[in-house]
């Protein structure tokens, strides 16, 4: 048996995951910076309270020893350990839970923003659908046969990673058609591709408008709701291909989970409005838009954010990259384009919408845990410092109480692991 190593340990998928976890856990969320600011004020205030306790106790008791014991108890019980652990403990537990579900947040700030998301925008092809479209129908222009149509289309699409391109290439291969060489390629985002194809001419593949013609009005049935790729050569129609794609098995459940916690789910796609409406009906989405260019998607996301919404965008293609970058939190599906992955703030390793629901719910739980931890830390100090100042807590008991507060914060953070197992 022969084995070939294609990457060093640090360059493997596991190495990437460990590096991402380390970098994310080392970053600070905005809420953590707030705790740091409070701690910076808290320490001198506690020192002042300890001195005041010493002075007043000595004044009223006449015993410097008793005064010193009370002052030391104040210092011990007010150690800001719990306050310092409140946020990083929750972030580490939350990041670990997310990584365990195959979700990579690039840093703690992204995770905090994800915990505040109230609107999710989803792409259609390859995100909500399986991304493995099958050819459902063909239309050939007069005088054109299937061989010419698939030669032209496969020549253009042979270097594309779009699901429709892969479907065209697979169909050409099934028919024994090899893509002829193509040169001088050009891509218009959200519209289509074109190139010079040997023996055919300047070929375009994409939306009918991009290819310079309209589909015949008598095309009915699947043509009304399918994704369509038109093909032309030198400005003349060669034909068109209708694709049928199915929903991912977990798409409906993921949308329902998000809606159940009050998150509005929208769909934006560059596909035909009829095809988008069909998927929206199956998923129960009230807001769905089709025929959107990459710029349209990004602008729509910005408009939602201008309304005060915290928006998450999920997609897998190059056409989604501008919207992913514009959103408060961009989620890219692993296996999509490199541009989408680099534009996003987080990566869904299994490439499913179910993972997106997991990510947002874990992020919400993490943010809730941080708030709980900060409350525990502040409540503990508000209660314990007066008791220590009046001599109701000895330094030994004060030390035990301080340790207990830290353990409480850590224990509360560790609940995130069980939360992730329960909701995911």
Kindly label every feature range from the protein language model.
Residues 1-14, 28-31, 159-171, 270, ...:
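Conserved actuator
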Residues 1-72, 363-369:
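Actuator/coupling domain of P-type ATPases
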Residues 7, 16, 27, 105, ...:
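Conserved ATP-binding TGD loop and adjacent catalytic N/P-domain core of P-type ATPases
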Residues 12-16, 20, 83-97, 124, ...:
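Conserved cytosolic headpiece of P-type ATPases
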Residues 34, 69, 82-156, 304, ...:
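Conserved catalytic phosphorylation-site environment of P-type ATPases
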Residues 40-78, 102, 375-401:
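Helix-interface capping motifs at the ends of transmembrane segments in multi-pass membrane proteins
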Residues 135, 139-263, 273, 285-301:
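P-type ATPase nucleotide-binding
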Residues 344, 349-424:
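Membrane-embedded transport module
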């Amino acid at each position: 048996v022969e084995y070939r190593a294609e990457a060093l340990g640090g360059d493997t998928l596991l190495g990437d995951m460990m590096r991402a976890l380390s970098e994310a856990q080392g970053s600070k969320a905005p809420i953590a910076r707030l705790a740091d600011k409070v701690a910076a004020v808290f320490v001198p205030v506690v020192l002042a309270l300890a001195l005041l306790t010493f002075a007043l106790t000595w004044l009223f008791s006449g015993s410097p020893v008793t005064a010193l014991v009370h002052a030391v108890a104040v210092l011990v019980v007010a150690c800001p350990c719990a306050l310092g652990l409140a946020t990083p403990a929750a972030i580490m537990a939350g990041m670990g839970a997310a990584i365990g579900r195959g979700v990579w947040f690039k840093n703690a700030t992204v995770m905090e923003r994800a915990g505040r998301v109230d609107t999710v925008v989803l792409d259609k092809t390859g995100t909500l659908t399986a991304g493995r479209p099958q050819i459902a129908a063909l239309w050939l222009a007069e005088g054109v046969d299937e061989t010419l149509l698939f030669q032209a289309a496969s020549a253009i699409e042979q270097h594309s990673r779009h699901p429709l391109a892969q479907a065209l290439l697979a169909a050409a291969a099934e028919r024994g058609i090899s893509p002829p060489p193509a040169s001088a390629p050009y891509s218009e985002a959200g519209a289509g591709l074109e190139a010079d194809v040997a023996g055919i001419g300047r070929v375009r593949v994409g939306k009918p408008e991009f290819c310079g013609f309209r589909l015949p009005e008598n095309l009915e049935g699947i043509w009304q709701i399918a994704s369509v790729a038109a093909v032309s050569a030198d400005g003349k129609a060669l034909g068109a291909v209708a694709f049928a794609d199915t929903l991912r098995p977990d798409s409906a459940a993921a949308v329902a989970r998000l809606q159940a916690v009050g998150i509005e789910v929208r769909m934006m796609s560059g596909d035909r409005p009829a095809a988008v409406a069909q998927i929206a009906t199956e998923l129960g989405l009230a807001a769905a838009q089709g025929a959107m260019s990459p710029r349209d998607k990004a602008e729509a996301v910005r408009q939602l954010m201008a309304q005060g919404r915290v928006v998450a965008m999920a997609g897998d293609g190059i056409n989604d990259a501008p919207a992913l970058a514009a959103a408060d939190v961009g989620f890219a599906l692993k296996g999509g384009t490199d541009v989408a992955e680099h534009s996003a703030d987080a990566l869904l390793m299994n490439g499913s919408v179910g993972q997106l629901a997991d990510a947002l719910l874990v992020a919400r739980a993490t943010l809730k845990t941080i708030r709980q931890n900060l409350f525990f830390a502040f409540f503990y100090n508000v209660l314990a410092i007066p008791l220590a100042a009046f001599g109701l807590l000895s330094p030994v008991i004060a030390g035990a109480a301080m340790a207990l507060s830290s353990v409480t914060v850590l224990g509360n953070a560790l609940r995130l692991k069980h939360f992730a197992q329960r909701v995911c």
